[in-house]
Amino acid sequence: MSLPNSTTVLPFLARLWQETAEQGGNVSGLARKSQLRDDSKLEALYILMVLGFFGFFTLGIMLSYIRSKKLEHSHDPFNVYIESDAWQEKGKAVFQARVLESFRACYVIENQAAVEQPATHLPELKPLS
C-alpha cells in the first residue's frame, strides 16, 4: 500500500491507532501509561508521606535542641561568668603581664672595651689554612 502524499498519512495513522486501542491489542507505551494514571497519584502520596515523616522528625529534633538550650540555668556560675565581662578584663590583664615579663627577660650584653675605646682596632681570628 503506497500513499501518494504526506497529508493522507496522518488520518491513516490516527485511524490505525484507534482501531488498535479499541481492540485492546498491542497498545503503545503512551496508551498504557494513560491507563495507570490513578496509580501515579498513590506514588506521589507515598513520596509526600515519606518526606513529611522525615520533615516532622527533623523538626522535632530541632525544637528539642532549642528547648534544651533555653532550659539552661541562668544562675549557673559558668553561664554567669561567660555573660559577664570579667573574664575579658582578666584576660587583658594577664596578656599585659606576660608582655611586661617578656620585656624584663630581654637584656643586652655590652662589650665594655668596645664602648670605652671605640677607635681601637679589635683583633680578628685568622683561618688556619
UniProtKB/Swiss-Prot annotation:
Record keywords, A-Z: Cell membrane, Glycoprotein, Ion channel, Ion transport, Membrane, Phosphoprotein, Potassium, Potassium channel, Potassium transport, Transmembrane, Transmembrane helix, Transport, Voltage-gated channel
The record's account of how the chain is modified after translation: Phosphorylation inhibits the potassium current. N-glycosylation at Asn-26 occurs post-translationally, and requires prior cotranslational glycosylation at Asn-5.
Gene Ontology cellular component list: apical plasma membrane; cell surface; membrane raft; voltage-gated potassium channel complex
Subcellular location: Cell membrane; Apical cell membrane; Membrane raft
Keyword Glycoprotein: yes
Pfam family of the protein (one): ISK_Channel
Record topological domains on the Cytoplasmic side: 67-129
Topological relation to the membrane, as annotated: Single-pass type I membrane protein
Chain positions found as Phosphoserine: 102
Coiled coil: none
GO biological process: cardiac muscle cell contraction; cellular response to cAMP; epithelial cell maturation; heart contraction; membrane repolarization during cardiac muscle cell action potential; membrane repolarization during ventricular cardiac muscle cell action potential; negative regulation of delayed rectifier potassium channel activity; positive regulation of potassium ion transmembrane transport
Free-text tissue specificity from the UniProt record: Restrictively localized in the apical membrane portion of epithelial cells.
Keyword Zinc included in the entry's annotation: no
Glycosylation sites: 5, 7, 26
Transmembrane segments: 44-66
Molecular function terms, GO-annotated: delayed rectifier potassium channel activity; potassium channel regulator activity; telethonin binding
Protein family membership: Belongs to the potassium channel KCNE family.
Role description: Ancillary protein that functions as a regulatory subunit of the voltage-gated potassium (Kv) channel complex composed of pore-forming and potassium-conducting alpha subunits and of regulatory beta subunits. KCNE1 beta subunit modulates the gating kinetics and enhances stability of the channel complex. Alters the gating of the delayed rectifier Kv channel containing KCNB1 alpha subunit. Associates with KCNQ1/KVLQT1 alpha subunit to form the slowly activating delayed rectifier cardiac potassium (IKs) channel responsible for ventricular muscle action potential repolarization.
Subunit structure of this chain's protein: Interacts with KCNB1. Interacts with KCNC2. Associates with KCNH2/HERG. Interacts with KCNQ1; targets the complex KCNQ1-KCNE1 to the membrane raft.
The name this protein goes by in its record: Potassium voltage-gated channel subfamily E member 1
Classification of source organism: Eukaryota, Metazoa, Chordata, Craniata, Vertebrata
